[in-house]
Amino acid sequence: MANTVILVDQPTLEKMKQTYLPFSNPKLPPGAVFAAKKPGVSITGYKSRKVMFQGVNGEVEAKKWVATLPESKTKAPSVSKGILPANFASKNVIGSDEVGTGDFFGPITVCAAYVDAEMMPLLKELGVKDSKAMKDPEICRIAEKIMPLVPHSVLLCPNPKYNELQKRGMNQGQMKALLHNRAIENVLKKLAPVKPEAILIDQFAEKNTYYRYLAKEPSIIREDVFFATKAEGLHLSVAAASIIARYKFVQAFDAMSKEVGIPLPKGAGPHVDAVAAEIIERFGLETLTKYTKQHFANTEKALKMVKK
C-alpha cells in the first residue's frame, strides 16, 4: 500500500496531534512529534511538518486535512509520490487535465485553468465539479459560462499531427506531457506578474517520467508542481480545466462529424469499428486516418470488416 504524505503548517500539525491523541502510539520514529493508529490507517507527524498516512484508509484520512470536499463513494484521490499543502482546495491554483486519449476519433485536448479563492463560490454556483458523470450538453452549458471568468489555455493535438508524432516514435504520454507543460506555461504568462500558489496536474505518469518526457523542451515548468490522480476532486481548477477541455473536444468532434458527413462515435469499442469501416468503404483509408488515432486496433478491425 503506497504512503500518502501531506505538508502542513505548524498550527495544523498541533491540531492534528490533539485530534489523534485518543489514538496515539507512544513509540515515535526518529523525527516524529506524534504517531497514531486508527482502523485501517497509521498516522505519523514529523518535525518537518510532513504527515504520513499508511494503510488502506490512508488516502481517505489524508483527504480530511488536504481538502474540504465531501467524501464520494468513488476511490479517493491518490497523491502519487507527492506532497499537497494543507488546505490545498482553498489555494490559488493552476489545474490541468486532458480528454480524448482513449477515443479512436478526435484530438487529444488539454486545458490548464487558473482558479483563485475569490472565484470558487461563483464557479461552484455555476456547477463546476467533477465532470465525469456530466453529459455533453451540461458540459457545454457550464463551459460557456466559466470560460470568460477563468484564465485558461486549451491545446489540441489534431489527428494528423498525432499520427505523425506516433510514427516518429513518440508515445501518448510524451504528447500529453508536452501539451500540459505548454498549456500551463501559457496560463502563467497570462497571469504574470501574479503567480499561483501551486500547479496541479491530473496524473497520467509518474513525476520522473513526466519530466523525462519534457527533457528536450526549452522551457519546463517545475516550480510548485504537484501530481495527483482524480485531481478534479482536489481542486476546482482541475475540475474547471476538465470541463473546458471536454467542451473543446466536443466542438472538435462535432466539426469532424459534419466534415465527414457521418456522426462519429466516442470511445474505441465495436460500435466505433463499424463507423470506421463505413468511412473506409465510402471515402478510403486515407480519409479515416485524418480523423483517427491510426495505431489503435480499431483501424485493423475496420479494415477486416471491409474485406469481408
Swiss-Prot record:
It comes from the Bacteria. GO terms for molecular function: magnesium ion binding; RNA binding; RNA-DNA hybrid ribonuclease activity. This is Ribonuclease HIII. A divalent metal cation binds at D97, E98, D202. Keywords: Cytoplasm, Endonuclease, Hydrolase, Magnesium, Metal-binding, Nuclease. Belongs to the RNase HII family. RnhC subfamily. The keyword Plastid does not apply. Its cofactor is Mn(2+); Mg(2+). One of its GO terms (cellular component) is ribonuclease H2 complex. InterPro entries: RNase_HII/HIII (IPR001352), RNase_HII/HIII_dom (IPR024567), RNase_HIII (IPR004641), RNase_HIII_N (IPR024568), RNaseH-like_sf (IPR012337), RNaseH_sf (IPR036397), TBP_dom_sf (IPR012295). Its main location: cytoplasm. GO terms for biological process: DNA replication, removal of RNA primer; mismatch repair. Manganese or magnesium. Binds 1 divalent metal ion per monomer in the absence of substrate. May bind a second metal ion after substrate binding. CDD domains: RNase_HII_bacteria_HIII_like (cd06590), RNAse_HIII_N (cd14796). The keyword Hydrolase applies. Residues 91-308 form the RNase H type-2 domain. It catalyses: Endonucleolytic cleavage to 5'-phosphomonoester. Endonuclease that specifically degrades the RNA of RNA-DNA hybrids. PANTHER family: RIBONUCLEASE (PTHR10954:SF23), RIBONUCLEASE H2 SUBUNIT A (PTHR10954).
